[in-house]
Amino acid sequence: MKKNQFLKESDVTAESVFFMKRRQVLKALGISAAALSLPHAAHADLLSWFKGNDRPPAPAGKPLEFSKPAAWQNNLPLTPVDKVSGYNNFYEFGLDKADPAANAGSLKTDPWTLKISGEVAKPLTLDHDDLTRRFPLEERIYRMRCVEAWSMVVPWIGFPLHKLLALAEPTSNAKYVAFETIYAPEQMPGQQDRFIGGGLKYPYVEGLRLDEAMHPLTLMTVGVYGKALPPQNGAPVRLIVPWKYGFKGIKSIVSIKLTRERPPTTWNLAAPDEYGFYANVNPHVDHPRWSQATERFIGSGGILDVQRQPTLLFNGYADQVASLYRGLDLRENF
């Protein structure tokens, strides 16, 4: 495995830029004006989630046992843990980047059930302990690129998805893998009301081609920075596909289903002209409302240190994954 290229420590994201972009997305979905039409009582009920003192704090993640294979270690400057866990998109808990950390303590992650079904010879179910004990865990330092044109470098902990799928024995009919987030509106305010959750249809769903899911880079992730995932990062288990935009990294997964047909995906359903099924990081294919040619790295510096850097094709993993898309028009299949 080739070492990844360096990112500059001083590259930091200007949050105001992306807050404006998020508002543009919500406007396109028709959320802003509709939200203003809510009666006062409804506003009070919704905003009660965000008052602060009545929300349980997120539990501290437990230390995990894991290896550090040399192939997945590198000298990339890491994004500090407070930014990894404090600057998140998880609309089930609100739209601002700080909302998930503030509100996700309500999510109960133990007990937990993850079911693998569909076009498999041996359907199976994992419980909470299985997620950290059934497979050897390893730390992998990956780039993470958001579709909003900001990026991080994160030391995720998990196991390759292909090991889990191998246990289920996909049949010859399996062509795709569909993922689903837990549906728990009593714990997730964004699922309870469309104005908190950005107007998306829940539960959140995602999908990969089977060959993408079986690729060694694709990681079922249970930890970060040496500890179990905090709720705002997708506890107890989430998907990391480092060559794709971050919205493909579905969080708090309860179902993995192998299918014959391409499964629906949440952001593609919401805005198919803006968010494709593949969502491969590509500096040559812009979002309709902003460029993807460059990105801002969230590092250890402050706002005055902001610098842009070029976006790398497949987020810097082209040597490993470009062959998956040989002959595929990446502009048409974005």
From Swiss-Prot:
Processing and modification events after translation: Predicted to be exported by the Tat system. The position of the signal peptide cleavage has not been experimentally proven.
Requisite cofactors: Mo-molybdopterin
Subcellular location: Periplasm
Enzyme class: oxidoreductase
Free-text cofactor note: Binds 1 Mo-molybdopterin (Mo-MPT) cofactor per subunit.
Residues in the signal sequence: 1-44
Main location: periplasm
Pfam families attached to this UniProt entry: Oxidored_molyb
Molecular function as annotated in GO: metal ion binding; molybdopterin cofactor binding; oxidoreductase activity, acting on a sulfur group of donors, quinone or similar compound as acceptor
Catalyzed reactions per annotation: L-methionyl-[protein] + a quinone + H2O = L-methionyl-(S)-S-oxide-[protein] + a quinol; L-methionyl-[protein] + a quinone + H2O = L-methionyl-(R)-S-oxide-[protein] + a quinol
PROSITE patterns given in the database record: TAT (PS51318)
Summary of the function given for this chain in its UniProt record: Part of the MsrPQ system that repairs oxidized periplasmic proteins containing methionine sulfoxide residues (Met-O), using respiratory chain electrons. Thus protects these proteins from oxidative-stress damage caused by reactive species of oxygen and chlorine generated by the host defense mechanisms. MsrPQ is essential for the maintenance of envelope integrity under bleach stress, rescuing a wide series of structurally unrelated periplasmic proteins from methionine oxidation, including the primary periplasmic chaperone SurA and the lipoprotein Pal.
Protein name: Protein-methionine-sulfoxide reductase catalytic subunit MsrP
The gene coding this protein: msrP
